[in-house]
Regions:
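Formylglycine-dependent sulfatase
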Residues: 1-203
Length: 203
């Protein structure tokens, strides 16, 4: 499953074909019933913070502070109740801090609440926090003997492997570039990778 349609299913309690959001190129119809709207009707204060990626603006939330599209890992831009705000830091830390701030100071402490906290971190391109850049600098992870497989007698597995290769890049997604640079990224993804790093602070 992918995150956008999964999120739409969670919000509506309906399968993707019923809620209309079948892939990440769709636009979520926010006019339909969702569980945050039902909670609002029962007196709950509702909020969503972090990854949204449903194209349309959130509905059924008293407060929302969401990443734009997939969001960026470094110095991400959010949309806070309709206004863009660029924040310095790593997406996981920034999103967590925003949630804690809302829980502590942003909500009515006398009311029950529902907070949806959606992190960027499970999503490609799986970039680490800057403090972890050197975490495995002295480590060497050799490729397993089965990394290059002939798939003899296993045609279904071969087909699945080709699907993974089509959708996931060894360098851009899986960070498998070796010291001799014998594994190369697809050219179209190199530009996307540069955009990610260009969003970082100079230091």
């Amino acid at each position: 499953s992918i995150s956008g349609p999964s999120r739409a299913c969670m919000l509506t309690g309906k399968h993707s074909h019923a809620n209309g959001f079948t892939d990440n190129s769709s636009s979520f119809d926010g006019s339909q019933q969702t569980f945050p709207k039902l909670l609002q009707q029962q007196g709950y204060e509702t909020a969503v913070i972090g990854k949204w990626h449903l194209t349309s603006e959130p509905t059924g939330f008293d407060h929302w502070d969401i990443l734009i599209g997939q969001g960026d890992y470094y110095n991400p831009t959010f949309i806070r109740n309709g206004e863009k705000v660029k924040r310095e830091g790593y997406a996981t830390n920034v999103t967590t801090d925003l949630a804690l701030e809302w829980l502590t100071n942003g909500r009515n402490q006398e009311k029950p609440f529902c907070l949806l906290l959606h992190h960027k971190a499970p999503h490609r391109t799986w970039m680490p926090d800057t403090c972890d850049f050197d975490l495995f600098a002295d480590s060497n992870f050799p490729l397993p003997e089965t990394f290059y497989d002939s798939y003899e007698g296993r045609e279904a597995a071969k087909g699945q492997r080709m699907s993974i290769t089509k959708d996931m890049d060894l360098v851009y997604d899986l960070k498998l570039a070796d010291k001799d640079s014998t594994i190369h990224s697809r050219p179209d993804l190199e530009a996307a990778g540069r955009r990610i790093y260009n969003n970082m602070n100079a230091e």
